[in-house]
Structure formats: structure tokens, C-alpha cells
Amino acid sequence: MNNIVIVGLQWGDEGKGKIVDYLSENADTVVRFQGGNNAGHTIVVDDEVYKLNLLPSAVLRTGKISIIGNGVALDPYALISEIESLRVKGMDINPNNLMVSESCPLILSVHKEKEKLFEDLNGNHKIGTTNKGIGPCYEDKVGRRAIRLCDLENADELNKRLDTLLNYHNAIRKGLSYRVIKKEEMLREIEEIAEKIIPYRKPVWKILNDFVKEGKKIIFEGAQGTFLDIDHGTYPFVTSSNTIASQVMTGSGLSSNAYVIGVAKAYTTRVGNGPFPTEQRNEVGNSLFTIGKELGTVSNRKRRCGWFDAVLVRQAVQLSGVSSIILTKLDVLDSFDKIKICTGYQYSGKIYDYLPASRSIQEELEPIYEEFPGWKENTQGEKLAEKLPVNLIKYVKRVEELIGIPIHLISAGPKREDVIKLKDFKFSESVLVSY
């Protein structure tokens, strides 16, 4: 199978960027298909730390093509800033190896202002957004008033689109006694960045379909995680896009089938507010936070930490049709005497083997745990499966049993090469990397 989808099976921060980087050595193209610069992927190469927000992880490998699909909310200033920051580090990024869908909706200053304004109005009921303007941009896309990348080359079309956009936003701003935005301001903002961003504009859907015909290997890189999905996540504490594998088709324009790989941490984290059944507000949570260095890549906010939730991950596997799991950050658990896995929930005398949709129930769920002895050995940087501690293998096998699909790779360390192969993949071996 030449097309692979990488999705997060928790609330994001599972280590997807590192896994995409690992698998991309023998791929041709990596595609972002949803989200925006509210997602952060951290990759360590030769002790150099790279933090990517919008750019696909393939930009760190020469000879690869990186693509941003139409499902991405595109902040043009953030993209150009990220490109320039990587160029300073010696990366060659140009319109031949980075292509952006002409249909991408653009995040503008009006979106960031609206998001912050409404978060402030929500007071104690904030969602905990990154204030990057992602949600308001998607609102405008669905409302058919967004400015898209393709609009920037046609002055008449851009003027019409701006009229529609500002009619909506200024009506809201007036109602809240907020400063009205003049069209000339928006035009200046767009003109400042248009010349830099337009060269990357491409008919991505056509290019991807041509790549498939040519037999090229494509990796689709998801952002956030399953339970931040607007439809299937812990609503309303979710992102504004679909994060599961089916979004690949609408977010890239490619209708081809793909092999879906899910990435999950060996424990659980989430940033911001919202239900979290296995959260540990105690020494366990503090240890996971400290050892795992759990700070948001984009927001720099402290991630909440808890035990691995097999119920949550199994549900995510079913939602995205996942065929294979990669379990990351096992080394974070090296020092624990006891390790727990959530195998079910209890609420009001009833046992749940799934995460109910109701927020009120989600917030009151009591996790049911299985407890395992820790391995108490340093595993960071280990490369060979046969050298792993017995108790670690037992833990991995139990996770595998509970989620119902095989774990092919595990990760024990932050570096690109800190990946251990447990099983062969069912798709073409040429996609894999051997260290």
C-alpha cells in the first residue's frame, strides 16, 4: 500500500511528527490535510530540535515534497515565518518542494481578534483555544465568506470577497461595541503577504492524483488527535476540524484508499480544558509531566497527564479504521513502580466500554484500571526489541489486546532514530526505515 495516513489516537501530542519523519525517509510526499498552526510537531535530528506548526514533517528531509491540503486553515504570515526560520537553519524550502492548495482558506487578523474576543466573553466557560484564529477561519469557510489563497491573484474577486467578509465581521464587532475594520486595512494586510505566498499555490488535488498514478508513496500527516475531532471528540472542548482518517479525502482531494496508522502515547495527555477520565492530579501526573517534558509545542501550556486509556484509544481506532499502532514515549514510564491501564468506565452504576457523547457524563466517569508492575530499567535510545525489559513487553502486549490491533513500532526517546520495530507492517516494506 503506497498511501499511509498517520492519525493521533488521543488528544494530540502523541508524537506523530516524529513518526512521520521516521517513515518519510522512503516516502515521496507528506501531506497535511486539516488543522492549522495550532498544532505543533517536535522532531529531533542530530540533537537539533525542530518545532513545526504548519509545515509537513517531510521538510526536514531532502528530496521530499511537502503539501498543504485544502482542509488546512492557512495563516500566510505564520507559514512564511516558519519557512524563513527553517531556511536560517539551512533547509531549502521552495515552490518545487512545498505546495499549498489554492483552495486553502486564509487566517487573517480579523479571525484572531474574533477568537480572543469570544474566549474573553466566555469567562469561566472558555474552551481553551490557542487564539490562532483557526475556529473563526473555519466558520467563514463554512459560511461561504472566507478569503482563499486562489483569491489573492484577482483584485476584483478579492474586493468582492472582502466586502462579504467584512459585512459579517463588522456587524458582530458593532454589536459588541468593538472597532470596525476598514477594507483598506485588510487589503494592506493581504498585499503585504500575497507576493510571498502566491508562488506556493497549486492545484493540490490534481497533483496528488497524478502522484498516485505514478506510484509515488504518500504519507498523510494528521494534526491534533481523535478526541479533538469536531464531531467525535469531547465536545465542546475540541478543535474546529475533523481529525480522523476520513478527513484525508476532503482535506486533500485524493479519493484513493490508504493504510491508516494510529499513534498513541504510552500514557495520556491533553492541553486545555475538557473531560479527561484518567487524569492524575497527583504525584503520578506530576512525574509524567516532568519526565515527559509535557509542555505544548505551540501554546507552551502545561499538558495534563494521566494513565493510558485503552477505551479511548480503541474507540479512536474504530473511528479512523486504524490497521496498525505506534506506541510512543515508553521511556517516560521507566521509573514507575506500578503502571495502570484504563479498561472501562463506571457511571451511575453502569459500566461503559466506550466514551459517551454527553459532556456531563464524560466529566463524571470513574476509570476502571488494571495494574502492572513497572520495568524499572532505562530504555531511552534502545534500538533492539529483544533487549527490552520483560515487563515492558507485557505492558505493550496487554495494550495490544485491549485495543484489538497490532502494535508494530514503539518509541523510547525523542530522537529520529529512537524507534523499535516489533512486527513487520503488512504494506510494502519499502515504506519502512531500518536503523
UniProtKB/Swiss-Prot annotation:
Any GO molecular function:
adenylosuccinate synthase activity
GO cellular component, alphabetical, reads:
cytoplasm
Binding residues annotated for GTP, in chain numbering: 12-18, 40-42, 303, 329-331, 411-413
Q: Could you say which enzyme class this protein belongs to?
A: ligase
Q: In which pathway does it act?
A: Purine metabolism; AMP biosynthesis via de novo pathway; AMP from IMP: step 1/2
Q: What is its main location?
A: cytoplasm
Which UniProt key words apply to this protein?
Cytoplasm, GTP-binding, Ligase, Magnesium, Metal-binding, Nucleotide-binding, Purine biosynthesis
**Main function:** Plays an important role in the de novo pathway of purine nucleotide biosynthesis. Catalyzes the first committed step in the biosynthesis of AMP from IMP.
Can you say what this protein is called? Answer: Adenylosuccinate synthetase
In its UniProt entry, the species of origin is given as Wolbachia sp. subsp. Brugia malayi (strain TRS)
